[in-house]
């Protein structure tokens, strides 16, 4: 078996990626999220496939088909809620994965980091389109509001919006194409994940110390496969607890009302995992400015390798930078809360202050702190 594992052209690739992969001996549980995201992606593709077998992408029957899945299909309710809450799980894991990358300076592996940003954008696009498919009130109005943002693009904006809609409003054509994109994007994500891993295995993994670990590596299997299984159990337990006890905890009650173009919901808001970006979008009174801030809130991640001015890679031994990162985390929690609140005083002001401090922390305070720490350490 060993011979085949190391000689067979296809099995050899799997062997070098998951079995004999030289891995730093000191990586912590923070390095489990990559494998958890892989499992989550597989689960989303499988549950999505089974949902697609019963779903109809037509404005007149989409809502009813989702109801039919929940009521009449064997374990349809389970598949539907696993898929919906699996998306929430996916984003929790992604945000933790990115947070770990920032804390331990993994963004210095710039190719892996940039592919990761592309992955984040692809996952966000997929989740947004998936939210439109049940054709509830929030699906319809969410699609209308978010696609309408493109009209802020000078000159070509309005034409672009109508082109995406496939008409003069969000309708059957929009739903059909969103379903098509929602189906194809996960497979593009799988290809990007493979590229992400390819670049990662070119350089080798980072580790909590931020130092070169070439002199102290161990095989991935059995040490980290066992460790990953523990992560799978934790994730599986959390997800099942959510699905079986409170499946609608993270959803919006408005989405249990069929889409009605003549009736606007009192508060249009996206799913919880987009609320921080939505709060940044809303905190700028100008439409184009808001759209640019929305994009910047995600694309600012691409600047991390450039803004890294510290002589140390990791934040493990940099207490001031460490505090700043936790302040940034708290700031994101505040933005998430504000994104779900109505546009009125004092929420508008809190949102604007949180948006300013978000960009200020990343673009100004973190690089300055890095330079200051270098001075303290006489580097």
Swiss-Prot record:
Its cofactor is heme b. Binds 2 heme b groups non-covalently. Heme b b562 binds at residues 83, 182. Heme 1 (or BL or b562) is low-potential and absorbs at about 562 nm, and heme 2 (or BH or b566) is high-potential and absorbs at about 566 nm. It comes from Myoprocta pratti (Green acouchi). GO terms for molecular function: metal ion binding; ubiquinol-cytochrome-c reductase activity. InterPro entries: Cyt_b/b6_C, Cyt_b/b6_C_sf, Cyt_b/b6_N, Cytb/b6-like_sf, Cytochrome_b, Cytochrome_b_C_euk/bac, Cytochrome_b_N_euk/bac, Di-haem_cyt_TM. Component of the ubiquinol-cytochrome c reductase complex (complex III or cytochrome b-c1 complex) that is part of the mitochondrial respiratory chain. The b-c1 complex mediates electron transfer from ubiquinol to cytochrome c. Contributes to the generation of a proton gradient across the mitochondrial membrane that is then used for ATP synthesis. It is found in: Mitochondrion inner membrane. The cytochrome bc1 complex contains 11 subunits: 3 respiratory subunits (MT-CYB, CYC1 and UQCRFS1), 2 core proteins (UQCRC1 and UQCRC2) and 6 low-molecular weight proteins (UQCRH/QCR6, UQCRB/QCR7, UQCRQ/QCR8, UQCR10/QCR9, UQCR11/QCR10 and a cleavage product of UQCRFS1). This cytochrome bc1 complex then forms a dimer. One of its GO terms (cellular component) is mitochondrial inner membrane. The lineage of its organism: Eukaryota, Metazoa, Chordata, Craniata, Vertebrata. CDD domains: cytochrome_b_C, Cytochrome_b_N. It is a multi-pass membrane protein. The chain crosses the membrane at residues 33-53, 77-98, 113-133, 178-198, 226-246, 288-308, 320-340, 347-367. A ubiquinone binds at residue 201. This is Cytochrome b. Heme b b566 binds at residues 97, 196. It comes from the Eukaryota. The keyword Metal-binding applies. One of its GO terms (biological process) is mitochondrial electron transport, ubiquinol to cytochrome c. It holds the Pfam family Cytochrome_B. Belongs to the cytochrome b family. Keywords: Electron transport, Heme, Iron, Membrane, Metal-binding, Mitochondrion, Mitochondrion inner membrane, Respiratory chain, Transmembrane, Transmembrane helix, Transport, Ubiquinone.
């Amino acid at each position: 078996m060993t011979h085949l594992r190391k000689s067979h052209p296809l099995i050899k690739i799997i062997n070098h990626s998951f079995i004999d992969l030289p891995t730093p001996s000191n990586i912590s549980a923070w390095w489990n999220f990559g494998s958890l995201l892989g499992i989550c992606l597989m689960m989303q593709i499988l549950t999505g496939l089974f949902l697609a077998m019963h779903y109809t992408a037509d404005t007149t029957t989409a809502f009813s088909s989702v109801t039919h899945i929940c009521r009449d299909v064997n374990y349809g309710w389970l598949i539907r809620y696993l898929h919906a809450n699996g998306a929430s799980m996916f984003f929790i894991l992604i945000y933790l994965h990115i947070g770990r990358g920032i804390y331990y300076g993994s963004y210095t592996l710039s190719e892996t980091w940039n592919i990761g940003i592309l992955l984040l954008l692809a996952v966000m696009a997929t989740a947004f389109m998936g939210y439109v498919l049940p054709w509830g009130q929030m699906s319809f109005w969410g699609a209308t509001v978010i696609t309408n943002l493109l009209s802020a693009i000078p000159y070509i904006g309005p034409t672009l919006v109508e082109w995406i809609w496939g008409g003069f409003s969000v309708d059957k054509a929009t739903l059909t194409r969103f379903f098509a994109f929602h189906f194809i994007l996960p497979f593009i994500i799988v290809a990007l994940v493979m590229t992400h891993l390819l670049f990662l295995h070119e350089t080798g993994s980072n580790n909590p110390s931020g130092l070169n670990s070439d002199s102290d590596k161990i095989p991935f299997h059995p040490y980290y496969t066992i460790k990953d299984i523990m992560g799978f159990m934790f994730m599986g337990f959390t997800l099942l607890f959510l699905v079986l006890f409170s499946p609608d905890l993270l959803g919006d009650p408005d989405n249990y009302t069929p889409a009605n173009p003549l009736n606007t919901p009192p508060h249009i808001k996206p799913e919880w995992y987009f609320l921080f970006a939505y709060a940044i979008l809303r905190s700028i009174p100008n439409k184009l400015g808001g759209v640019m801030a929305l994009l910047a809130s995600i694309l600012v991640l691409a600047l991390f390798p450039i803004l890294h001015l510290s002589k140390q890679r990791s934040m493990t031994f940099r207490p001031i930078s460490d505090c700043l990162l936790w302040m940034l985390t708290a700031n994101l929690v505040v933005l998430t809360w504000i994104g779900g609140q109505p546009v009125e005083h004092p929420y508008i002001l809190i949102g604007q202050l949180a948006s300013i401090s978000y960009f200020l922390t990343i673009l100004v305070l973190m690089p300055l702190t890095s330079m200051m720490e270098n001075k303290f350490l006489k580097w």
